[in-house]
Design a protein with these regions (language model features):
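N-terminal, polar/Ser/Thr-rich
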Residues: 4-5, 9-38, 67, 449-455
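Beta-strand-rich binding/interaction modules
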Residues: 68-70, 205-209, 472-535
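Amphipathic alpha-helical substructures
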Residues: 282, 395-477
Length: 555
């Protein structure tokens, strides 16, 4: 009863996200035969809140347990509990609540020595309990310690190092991504040093972690991660060979050699196009890509810094799109996630357009919009500034929305102006949020404040277009002058194409429709107008079922 009462008092006073972890110094021992992980080490935490803090929260995967926590070489006072959260593949965390001797002032730090251990088998609990099919869940949550392959990603997959975060729930489309995003933002300046010992390793197995490309396991190997926002701590133990390409080191399982060759060719194929569209912005130092093969053919890819974990047995299209994303990331460095993540997605869509068609590219865009639509629907009344592309911590949301923003920007200003602006971009000069807007305006000679206000600096949701009226008037000499009025029921303004279907051919005019407003456009029809359509798929909107209007001419 005393422990329960103590825990209740602690939990009521907890601010789980008050602290950032500024440094980890960990010793890891992995026993693949037992799927076991043992960790001893030191961590430094800083109070980043505005108030003194008496309690510190430490969380690890629920398949691990706390063995010891010390402060100043003395056992710390702490209690433990299971904390439900989907930031770990088990759907839960083993949480230790540490009582400090006295409240820690804002910006002050505390050093803790910790010990924890347990097993890490593959676990799909968090996914299957929300209805994800078992096979799909295994392809997503493939992390595990085993004799044949060991792969552990960090927060968001397996919490194998201590964190402190509010709960995330997979039933909420944005909960996990937002929680992980807030954590990563707090860890932007953090550093982790880890010594990894792998028991009973074969002669062919190697360790991949941090900046280590291919370390033997005959003795403990040192791993280093800096900037835990961009470089999520992970490690892989696997028997892999190396294919050193011009721009990437590709590590592959011996049976996947042909896939490694295919990926090397894919990188070579896409790099010239990326250079044309985005320019060359890499520093030339530390930007060489690294690819690590996964043994599961449908495993979900993962990226950390310049490293990609992915199955090299994927189909040709998937390999090409991964190569586009990787090349875009390495060749366009920006401190702003909406720029870097968005341009990676934009480059993929642009490549599909180049190799296939505009229709195929827009179909690809539309097929990936459902999550964006769901995310916007789930946040009515949220703070438009905090949910904006420049402030949101939800990486998936930022990537998805920013991809569409870049596609719309190309539609607005044209490829020539957009390409010139991107070539002129300098990351070191990007000191304020409006820098990119000014670059594009300088090349396009258009005022884009309305667009950036609604799509980048604030989240106004998505537009929702419908045609409210069409008036066709016969003109001398034949044909019709058709006036189309479109209404935007949503909050975000957009320049949208209005298509007039005729008995012989189509005509297209673009129209800017502000949020919660109407606008009209006149189109000269050379033959009988049949149907008016607003939006060809280039603009994301919340409802596309009301975009067509059948024209009835008065005879």
């Amino acid at each position: 009863m005393g422990v329960l009462l103590c825990l209740t008092i602690h939990a009521s006073a907890l601010d789980r996200e008050a602290f950032s972890f500024t440094r980890y110094d960990l010793d890891l021992t992995l026993d693949p035969g037992q799927q076991r992980l043992g960790v001893r080490g030191k961590i430094t935490l800083r109070n980043d809140s505005d108030a003194p803090q008496r309690f510190v929260t430490l969380q690890i995967s629920s398949s691990l347990h706390w063995a010891s926590i010390q402060m100043a070489d003395k056992s710390a006072e702490f209690v433990t509990q299971t904390y439900a959260s989907d930031v770990d593949h088990t759907g839960g965390l083993s949480e230790a609540i540490v009582t400090l001797p006295k409240p820690l002032a804002p910006k002050d730090t505390v050093n803790l020595t910790v010990g924890y251990e347990g097993v890490i088998p593959q676990d799909t609990t968090r996914l299957t309990r929300v209805g994800v099919p078992a096979n799909t869940a295994k392809d997503s949550d493939w992390d595990q310690i085993s004799a044949s392959f060991t792969g552990l990603r960090g927060i968001g997959y397996v919490v194998w190092y201590p964190i402190a975060a509010h709960a995330a729930n997979m039933s909420d489309p944005s909960s996990l991504s937002e929680t992980v995003g807030r954590w990563k933002r707090r860890e932007r300046d953090a550093e982790m040093v880890a010594s990894v010992a792998f028991l009973a390793a074969s002669d062919r197995q190697r360790l991949f972690c941090g900046d280590v490309g291919l370390a033997a396991l005959d003795k403990p190997a040192a791993c280093l991660w800096r900037d835990l926002d961009a470089n999520v701590p992970f490690f892989v133990v696997s028997a892999q060979e190396l294919l050193a390409g011009p721009s990437a080191d590709i590590f592959y399982l011996p049976e996947h050699k042909s896939g490694a060759n295919d990926y090397a060719m894919a990188l070579k194929q896409v790099e010239p196009s990326i250079a044309v569209w985005l320019g060359q912005h890499s520093s030339g130092e530390g930007t060489r890509a690294r690819v690590i093969d996964l043994p599961y053919p449908d495993a979900a890819p993962f990226e950390s810094g310049n490293t990609w974990l992915m199955p090299l047995t994927a189909d040709e299209t998937s390999l090409l799109l991964m190569a586009v994303q990787q090349s875009a990331k390495l060749n366009f460095l920006s401190p702003r996630p909406w720029i870097s993540l968005g341009l990676q997605g934009y480059a993929q869509v642009r490549y599909i357009e180049q190799e296939k068609s505009r229709e195929t590219a827009q179909a690809y865009l539309q097929s990936h919009r459902e999550a964006l639509i769901d995310a916007e629907r789930s946040l009515p009344g949220s703070d438009p500034a905090m949910r904006s592309l420049i402030n949101s911590t939800d990486e998936f949301y930022v990537r998805t929305k920013a991809t569409n923003v870049w596609w719309m920007l190309r539609e607005l200003v044209g490829e020539t102006a957009l390409t010139a602006a991107l070539h002129n971009y300098k990351a070191e000069e990007d000191k304020d949020a409006m820098y990119m807007q000014r670059l594009i305006e300088a090349q396009s000679h258009r005022d884009l404040a309305w667009f950036f206000d609604d799509w980048v600096y604030r989240d106004r949701g998505l537009p929702d277009f419908r045609i409210t009226s069409v008036f066709a008037r016969a003109v001398v000499g034949g044909g019709y002058l058709v006036t189309v009025t479109a209404e935007n029921l949503g909050g975000a303004a957009a320049e949208v194409p209005v298509i007039l279907r005729m008995s012989t051919k189509d005509a297209v005019e673009k129209l800017v429709v502000p949020g919660k407003s109407k606008a009209s456009v006149r189109i000269l029809a050379g033959s009988t107008p049949i149907r008016a359509i607003v939006n060809d798929g280039s603009v994301p909107e919340s409802d596309t079922r009301n975009n067509e209007y059948t024209i009835e001419l008065n005879q």
